[in-house]
């Protein structure tokens, strides 16, 4: 009897706790609604640039909150071409480098190596050969890199990054990086003003919006 009573009370308390937790999130404080329609599948997309110091610093934070995302929430990266003094063509090359990394098993290592090349080694990517060198250093066959970088699938993904960039810039949602957008509909407001700074808090907010 006691066990049944406890189970009944728990069943009542859990929905109330979940509702209370969700009610803590406020539009305009913790997130902004930037579109009417949401993506068909739950996702969070980070708009970033390899040239952005803040994006580089965020990598460690992402590595902490990403594992805490619900299994149905996919984390995606999208490279932009409007950061710093680098010309758009060079930055677009880096978008294509990300797209190439996306189809390789060493993806995470490659992304980390590119950030490290720019922000730790203080080295430059002046031409495609520089990008290739980083990929080869991470175990990617040189010929395979050449084929993948020019492949239709990689060019298509890179083009989509550009389209997404322009779309969200027009919406007024993408003014700087890093910017996180959930389901193509909600822009996260991270920082002191919203109080969402810790990895656990970020993952909870993403999960809430992704399943909203």
Which functions belong to the PLM regions below?
Residues 2-86, 162, 166-171, 205-212:
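Extracytoplasmic thiol/disulfide redox context detector
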Residues 49, 137-212:
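C-terminal cap of thioredoxin/glutaredoxin-like
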Residues 51, 66-69, 101-105, 114, ...:
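Sec/Tat-exported extracytoplasmic proteins
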Residues 57-129:
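Structural alpha/beta surface segment adjacent to cysteine/selenocysteine redox centers
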Residues 5, 93-103, 107, 186, ...:
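Conserved short hydrophobic patches within well-ordered secondary structure
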Residues 41, 94, 176-177:
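A structure-centric signal for secondary-structure junctions around beta-strands
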């Amino acid at each position: 009897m006691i066990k049944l009573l406890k189970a009944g009370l728990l069943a009542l308390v859990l929905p109330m706790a979940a509702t209370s937790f969700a009610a803590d999130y406020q539009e305009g404080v913790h997130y902004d609604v930037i579109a009417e329609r949401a993506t068909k599948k739950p996702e969070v997309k980070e708009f970033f640039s390899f040239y952005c110091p803040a994006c580089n610093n965020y990598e460690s934070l992402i590595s902490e909150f990403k594992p805490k995302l619900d299994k149905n929430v996919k984390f995606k990266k999208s490279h932009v071409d409007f950061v710093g003094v680098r010309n758009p063509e060079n930055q677009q090359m880096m978008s294509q480098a990300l797209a190439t990394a996306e189809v390789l098993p060493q993806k995470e290592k490659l992304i980390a190596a590119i950030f490290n090349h720019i922000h730790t080694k203080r080295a430059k990517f002046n031409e495609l050969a520089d990008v290739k060198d980083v990929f080869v250093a991470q175990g990617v066959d040189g010929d395979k890199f050449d084929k993948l970088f020019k492949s239709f699938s990689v060019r298509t993904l890179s083009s989509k990054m550009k389209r997404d960039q322009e779309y969200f810039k027009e919406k007024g949602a993408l003014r700087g990086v890093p910017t996180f957008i959930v389901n193509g509909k909600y822009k996260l407001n991270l920082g002191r003003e919203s109080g969402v700074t810790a990895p656990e808090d970020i993952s909870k907010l993403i999960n809430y919006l992704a399943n909203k």
